[in-house]
Amino acid sequence: MEELQGYLEKDGSRQQNFLYPLIFQEYIYTLAHDHGLNSSIFYEPMEIVGLGYDNKSSSVLVKRLITRMYQQNSLIYSMNDFNQNLFVGHNNSFYSHFYSQMVSEGFAVIVEIPFSLRLVPSSEEIPKSQNLRSIHSIFPFLEDKLSHLNYVLDILIPYPIHLEILVQILQCWIQDVPSLHFLRFFLHEFHNWNNFLTPTKSISVFSKENKRLFRILYNSYVSEYEFVFFFLRKQSYYLRSTSSGAFLERTHFYVKIEHLIDVCHNHFQKILWFFKDSFMHYVRYKGKAILASRGTYLLIKKWKCYLVNFWQYYFHFWSKPYRIHINPFSNYSFYFLGYISSVLINPSAVKNQMLENFYLVDTLTQKFDTIVPVIPLIGSLSKAKFCTILGHPISKPIWAELSDSDIIDRFGRICRNLSHYHSGSSKKQSLYRIKYILRLSCARTLARKHKSTVRNLLQRLGSGLLEEFFTEEEQVISPIFPKTTLFPLHGSHRERIWYLDIIRINDLANYLDWS
């Protein structure tokens, strides 16, 4: 444990000072407001509790919020006095919700600074990679590695029950005591109002207004767990390690780090000897992780027991064992990054000849396969109000006030992004149903705007109005390969294509990961 403590203390970049004064800077809230407008492909105007506001009025409210924070001397030093609340003491629900949302978003921008600085290369070293690193690059890795493994641990990363655990973990990254007190005060107040957490069984579902702050806290918790977990694993291997770090929703700070692990000959090898497995791979996105191994069932079961005890003794909360499932790759499919992935076994017969004798040899080959999860996608379309839970298209009332070109552009952009992101599916025909839902939802939205029916609208404007929904994937989304033909490539619906320009998961698939 002494080496573990030294490993934690050696990383001096984990701590930053003097973040608290930034809470009183107006430009912080401007950055948070701009991020909220431009972070989604749906791009819906930001509204608070059903009331709209423009940029000028929001700027005035931000200045008023900063003034109130300056005047509240008891904000940090009188934590026990909750009768006078800075954010919800106002009689108008609009102001209370606006203040709470802006403080949450502004503090999230501030807390991102230590994480961002860790990913900015120093002036002495030369950056080895550029910003862009496609999410699709993980799938060729899985295709190359997982087809040769035996077992997989499908892990739902447990969440701390008490919010104080998240604050204590963040304390490892930030030494600014006033900022931590401010965060503790803010979380405690929201927890009392039952407003910060939605009334669900999982802490991982936060209200829409405060989701960004939660992602900061959750990401710091996951980073801490992986920081210690990988240290223990690295102590028992003479292997070259390549690690890639990317802060959630901050892909522009992506940096690839390569280093050679120094193996220590000490008691760690005696403790971890039964975990040695040179064919183990770990992949995580948000709250879901995959730990795959070529070892035996006994070895993978030991890893499960170790993870449960690790969360219990290091983070001081109980991790339910049923959140970690052990499954053989031969008959198991798992959902990851918007795809349903599995390892298929393909039998084949090979004809051999020796002199005048012929004989057949039956062989089994394993192939990593990815398909589009149609039913979950329909569920996310239903949550986004494009269709019913059964998949029947409906109009989008919030977009009915836009111009016809804007409505068509938004629906078409969503459709193209889905085709782009799911280009790695081996069965692209399943996307036709999703395109049909979006196309008819667009038509009904236009009909709602013009107070007409879909049939009359198409007769008046022409069926070519929605022709871009039928545009083949190869004609629209290829920024790498030039468009050389007007006809789709033969058999392209069966070919898997991984693109190098996808820096974020599709929003519809993203809904599934956070639901």
From Swiss-Prot:
InterPro entries: Domain_X, Maturase_MatK, Maturase_MatK_N
Keywords assigned by UniProt, alphabetized: Chloroplast, mRNA processing, Plastid, RNA-binding, tRNA processing
GO CC annotations on file: chloroplast
Pfam families assigned to the protein according to its UniProt record, in alphabetical order: Intron_maturas2, MatK_N
Any one Gene Ontology molecular-function term assigned to this protein's record: RNA binding
Transmembrane residue ranges: none
GO terms under biological process: mRNA processing; RNA splicing; tRNA processing
Localization annotation: Plastid, Chloroplast
Main location (coarse class): plastid
Similarity-based family: Belongs to the intron maturase 2 family. MatK subfamily.
Task of the protein: Usually encoded in the trnK tRNA gene intron. Probably assists in splicing its own and other chloroplast group II introns.
HAMAP family assigned: MatK
Name of the protein in question: Maturase K
Native organism taxonomy: Eukaryota, Viridiplantae, Streptophyta, Embryophyta, Tracheophyta
